UniProtKB/Swiss-Prot annotation:
Species lineage: Bacteria, Pseudomonadati, Pseudomonadota, Betaproteobacteria, Burkholderiales
Keyword Zinc among UniProt keywords: no
Location(s), subcellular: Cytoplasm
Entry's EC annotation: 5.4.3.8
Family from the record: Belongs to the class-III pyridoxal-phosphate-dependent aminotransferase family. HemL subfamily.
Keywords tagged on the record: Cytoplasm, Isomerase, Porphyrin biosynthesis, Pyridoxal phosphate
Cross-referenced Pfam families: Aminotran_3 (PF00202)
Bridged cysteine pairs (disulfide): none
Catalytic activity: (S)-4-amino-5-oxopentanoate = 5-aminolevulinate
InterPro entries, per database record: 4pyrrol_synth_GluAld_NH2Trfase (IPR004639), Aminotrans_3 (IPR005814), Aminotrans_3_PPA_site (IPR049704), PyrdxlP-dep_Trfase (IPR015424), PyrdxlP-dep_Trfase_major (IPR015421), PyrdxlP-dep_Trfase_small (IPR015422)
EC main group: isomerase
Protein name: Glutamate-1-semialdehyde 2,1-aminomutase
PROSITE patterns, alphabetized: AA_TRANSFER_CLASS_3
Length: 427
């Protein structure tokens, strides 16, 4: 029995499912999860000592690679000063100033400890600001596990939303309307029917939890125009795509300003940190200035802030995003070429340092299209690549991530492994 198997059996005795986040359990792909012992650059090593090329990167934060020496030094420099204070620090101001500088639509920002806290707080703030209750979200977009966001579409446009998780009261779910991603007609119909009831529309401008699906410019511009017309707050959930698709996130990529923005992952540099921010007049409704309560014991934790601030400084290096985008595109295009050569139906896409792999004829534009992918074939491909020492997301419905340490040799090794994997699939 491998060390990974031993650890997984042991973990299941004291941790539900043996993991602290469901996707890690390998339920989608089958087999035994890899327990990570250490990581460096684009690699990690599991409990059996096997090395893997890592295309998850802690689900996005590790944009400069694992244990970057400057990030490590920044963390080490603050450790001796104290782990947490429950009081303001100068470093909190510095990271807030950096975020406001990099994301033009953010005039003020508040730190929290997780992406779920960021989206949950942004929605509460939007409701407090507008005095309305209804939220609009989109099928396939993931915004954390707050009750009001674990909702799927009802049977028709005006039907109340239905909870997607046990433990979510129907009375909460009914305030959330779920529409199809990238469907402008459905969006216009919804605003025509109840636009003046909508407190906020929350969207991933580049979705990463139904695999990678880009928001179309037409869709995102329609969102901006309709929210402005009806006085609804437009919330861009950039927890995943923020500082991933461009230095200023999806908003600078598309040239669209949100009213509120949720950030995470990269801004913590691998530590638990997230944030939400936006227009000053909206943020002024937060306590202690306004009546919308939000708080957190570890918000602005000095260790997380040190890691995040150094990461934000590193990604501003000249040419950083040009090189990262080119390398990610090389990976995606190379995988598609290898599949084509083997005669395996497959498509790939990339934007910035995010990529998507689809066992389908074309790149999907909605959740319904994503679900038509051949999941069984993906699962086989995942395990073939895992055996080759390449670690993709253990689910057909997750995006992948490239770091600045994924150099030509790493990409070449990945494509060589993929060539063998696609050949096995085609056999």
């Amino acid at each position: 029995m491998s060390n990974n198997q031993i650890l997984f059996e042991r973990a299941q005795k004291t941790i539900p499912g043996g993991v602290n986040s469901p996707v890690r359990a390998f339920r989608s792909v089958g087999g035994t999860p890899r327990f990570v012992a250490r990581a460096q650059g684009p690699y990690f090593w599991d409990a059996d000592g096997k090395q893997y090329i890592d295309y998850i990167g802690s689900w996005g934060p590790m944009i400069v690679g694992h244990v970057h020496p400057e990030v490590l030094s920044a963390v080490q420099n603050v450790l001796a000063d104290g782990f947490s204070f429950g009081a303001p620090t100068e470093a909190e101001i510095e990271i807030a100033e950096e975020i406001c500088k990099l994301v033009p639509s953010i005039e003020q920002v508040r730190m929290v400890s997780s992406g779920t806290e960021a989206t949950m707080s942004a929605l509460r703030l939007a409701r407090g600001f507008t005095g309305r209750s209804r939220i609009v979200k989109f099928e396939g977009c993931y915004h954390g596990h707050a009750d009001s966001l674990l909702v799927k579409a009802g049977s028709g446009l005006l039907t109340f939303g239905n909870p997607t998780s046990a433990g979510v009261p129907a009375d909460i779910a009914k305030h959330t309307t779920v529409l199809e991603y990238n469907n402008v007609a459905a969006l216009e119909e919804a605003f025509g029917a109840f636009g003046d009831e909508i407190a906020a529309v929350i969207v991933e401008p580049v979705a990463g939890n139904m695999n990678l699906v880009r928001g179309t410019p037409e869709f995102l511009n329609a969102l901006r125009a309709l929210c402005t017309k009806h006085g609804a707050v437009l919330i861009f959930d950039e927890v995943m795509c923020g500082f991933r698709v461009a230095l200023g996130g999806a908003q600078t990529y598309y040239g669209i300003a949100a009213d509120l923005t949720c950030l995470g992952k990269v801004i913590g540099g691998g530590m638990p940190a997230a944030a939400f921010g936006g227009r000053r007049d909206i943020m002024a409704h937060l306590a202690p200035l306004g009546g919308v309560y939000q708080a957190g014991t570890l918000s602005g934790n000095p260790i997380a802030v040190a890691a995040g601030l150094k990461t934000l400084q590193l990604i501003q290096a000249p040419g950083f995003y040009d090189a990262l985008t080119a390398q990610t595109k090389r990976l995606a295009d190379g995988l598609a070429a290898e599949a084509r050569a083997a005669g395996v139906p497959f498509a790939a896409d990339s934007i910035g340092a995010m990529f998507g792999l689809y066992f389908a004829e074309r790149v999907p534009g909605s959740f319904a299209e994503v679900t038509k992918s051949n999941v069984e074939r993906f699962n086989r491909f995942f395990h073939l690549m895992l055996d080759e020492g390449v670690y993709f997301a253990p689910s057909a419905y997750e995006a992948g991530f490239v770091s600045s340490t994924h150099d030509d040799a790493v990409i070449d090794a990945t494509l060589a492994a993929a060539r063998r994997a696609f050949a096995a699939l085609a056999a």
